[in-house]
């Protein structure tokens, strides 16, 4: 029974994410032209907004089941008002139409048919595996354990006995959501969905550079790798990180060809979300920053205010998006990247 409730809760949360994300995209004028992008961006923006809401509850009001249920109820009502114009009906129509087009495509190639069957079977198996109790060491030691400590203390705290207490836990806020409501399988259902979304974001990236068929092959081979299959039934944050990285690169490439600032700022937002998800996001932040400098190199030689402003604004947006977790670390330990900055910040507990 708990598994069924977890699934229903996941569906409701997905609706909330899409509704909130759609509103954010509309507010900033970031709605893309392709429907697939709209749905993916809406979910990821809504997902991130909920993660930050849960974070700020933990540093202010405190974690109680009544507060979380009240917030979710309010967000669900708000989402239905946002989506009342038929957005969900359009989503269903889009899925049906995509399936029809998918059937037409796969009948033209035995290879596409084989890959299509493979990804469907694997996704179903991953979905079933997501309902098993968590056994992964990292999930049990901090992806689920640290949010459980937050729940026990009813706020975001710091304990110095384990290095992972200092890492950004943006994605783990959804783990906390499931745990505090009493549905331990919920985080794994959401992470299963993140596996599919990360494959779709790779498709969006690859199809923009090459072709739709190339994007399909890239997404399928990515999703069928053993690592992604393993991650799809855990509570880890890697799949969320991959989604942010793929979209950050995608919008950077779009900006390089069209020079539309909104696509560059979208790239910056997803870079910031990558930084808020794991310390490994720094690897991506440095890489995409170097990529931006290379793309802008000809303009940088002119040293105009505009060419200098672009990298600075990009970095500022990324920093602001990721900053809550690093500010939290600085307040609690004196080291924003605890424990790795101890030699610079002379931080505590190390």
Can you annotate each of these PLM segments?
Residues 1-103:
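Membrane-embedded, hydrophobic transmembrane alpha-helices
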Residues 22, 48-51, 76-83, 186-209, ...:
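Transmembrane-helix motifs of polytopic, lipid-linked glycan transferases
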Residues 32-41, 185-186, 200-226, 257, ...:
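Transmembrane-helix signature of polytopic, membrane-embedded enzymes
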Residues 101, 284-318, 326:
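Perimembrane helix-loop-helix junctions
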Residues 218, 265-269, 280-295:
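Transmembrane-embedded, aromatic-rich helix segments that form part
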Residues 218-223, 250, 271, 275:
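Short helix- or helix-capping micro-motifs
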Residues 230-240:
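Short acidic/glycine- and proline-prone juxtamembrane loop motifs at membrane-interface regions
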Residues 248-264, 298:
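Membrane-interface transmembrane helices that cradle and orient dolichyl/undecaprenyl
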């Amino acid at each position: 029974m708990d598994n069924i409730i977890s699934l229903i809760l996941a569906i409701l949360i997905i609706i909330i994410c899409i509704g909130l994300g759609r509103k954010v995209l509309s507010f900033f004028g970031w709605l893309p032209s392709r429907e697939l992008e709209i749905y993916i961006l809406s979910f990821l923006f809504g997902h991130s907004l909920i993660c930050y809401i849960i974070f700020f509850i933990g540093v202010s009001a405190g974690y109680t089941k009544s507060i979380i249920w009240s917030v979710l109820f309010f967000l669900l009502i708000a989402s239905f008002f946002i989506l009342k114009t038929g957005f969900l009906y359009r989503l269903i129509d889009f899925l049906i139409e995509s399936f029809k087009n998918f059937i037409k495509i796969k009948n033209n190639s035995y290879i596409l048919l084989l890959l299509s069957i493979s990804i469907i079977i694997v996704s179903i198996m991953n979905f079933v595996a997501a309902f098993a109790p968590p056994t992964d060491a990292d999930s049990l030691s901090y992806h689920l354990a640290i949010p459980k400590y937050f729940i026990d203390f009813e706020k975001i705290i710091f304990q110095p006995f384990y290095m992972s207490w200092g890492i950004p836990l943006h994605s783990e806020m959804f783990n906390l959501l499931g745990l505090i409501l009493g549905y331990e399988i919920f985080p794994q259902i959401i992470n299963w969905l993140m596996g599919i979304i990360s494959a779709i974001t790779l498709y969006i990236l690859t199809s923009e550079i090459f072709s739709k068929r190339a994007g399909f092959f890239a997404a399928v081979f990515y999703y069928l790798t053993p690592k992604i299959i393993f991650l799809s039934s855990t509570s880890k944050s890697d799949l969320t990180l991959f989604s942010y990285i793929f979209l950050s690169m995608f919008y950077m490439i779009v900006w390089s060809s069209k020079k539309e600032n909104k696509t560059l700022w979208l790239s910056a937002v997803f870079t910031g979300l990558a930084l808020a998800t794991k310390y490994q996001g720094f690897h991506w932040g440095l890489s995409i920053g170097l990529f931006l400098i290379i793309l802008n190199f000809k303009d940088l030689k002119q040293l105009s205010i505009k060419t200098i402003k672009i990298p600075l604004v990009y970095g500022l947006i990324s920093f602001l998006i990721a900053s809550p977790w690093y500010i939290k670390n600085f307040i609690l330990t004196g080291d924003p990247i605890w424990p790795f900055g101890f030699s610079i910040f002379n931080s505590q507990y190390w």
